[in-house]
Amino acid sequence: VYHKNNRISTVVSATNKTLSFNKKWTVANGMVQLATAFPQAKIVWCNTHCQENLNLKSIEVLFHHNKMMLSYCPDDNSYLGSKIGYVEESPFIKVNKKVSYPTWQMSSAVGVIHAAVLLEIKDKIKTDCDFDYYLNSVAKIGMPLGLLCYSEPKLLTETTIEKSSKASVFDLFKFVKEHYRTRWLFLLLLNFVVYEFRFPVV
């Protein structure tokens, strides 16, 4: 699934056949629809900026288990940014981009997941949201349930730094509200006031 600006641009099968799709779909919705149509397939997503460097050959080796989710963000900063560290101090936050690294922080730049996983959680996550938000939600929900999520640099043959999508303050608070206990929402707000010297208007 090649995409740009939160919309699908092209869908290509493993046999290099171009597949039809609804241009009104968000990328997340399109992936769920593809998972429904091809429930045994590995679904790869790639931003058009990274298309020339997509390492499809590596996926067969790297993606050795159906309960895996691999992704890679060439940008130094993740979608949710460093401020997610206000509510979580786990090793999953500071990702080593040079090696395969366990983390729930996924990226719309490039990645792969099995259709069965998307079908399993399709009723738990809305698909009308930003694609990065959707991917991070999938991993955040999936990891405690046994989904193996990794940042994997080998998904790209060459790393080119592209500005990736970043969460707004509203999206950050929304993510914390959906995936953490309520007290962490108040802690995030407190940290914004104390360390950012501002009261976030969301």
Labelled PLM ranges:
Residues 123, 157-173:
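Mixed-charge (acidic/basic) macromolecular-recognition segments
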Residues 8, 32-85:
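Conserved donor NDP-sugar-binding/catalytic core segment of glycosyltransferases
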Residues 1-40:
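Active-site-proximal specificity loops/subdomain of glycosyltransferases
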Residues 2-12, 90, 167-202:
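C-terminal, non-catalytic tails of nucleotide-sugar-dependent glycosyltransferases
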Residues 102-109, 113, 118, 122-130:
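Conserved nucleotide-sugar donor-binding catalytic segment
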Residues 84-86, 92-93, 106, 133-140:
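Non-catalytic protein-protein interaction scaffold segments in large eukaryotic complex-forming proteins
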Residues 108, 127-130, 136-159, 177-188, ...:
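Catalytic donor-sugar/metal-binding loop of nucleotide-sugar-dependent glycosyltransferases
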Residues 77-80, 89-113:
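A recurrent flexible, glycine/aromatic-enriched loop bordering the glycosyltransferase active site
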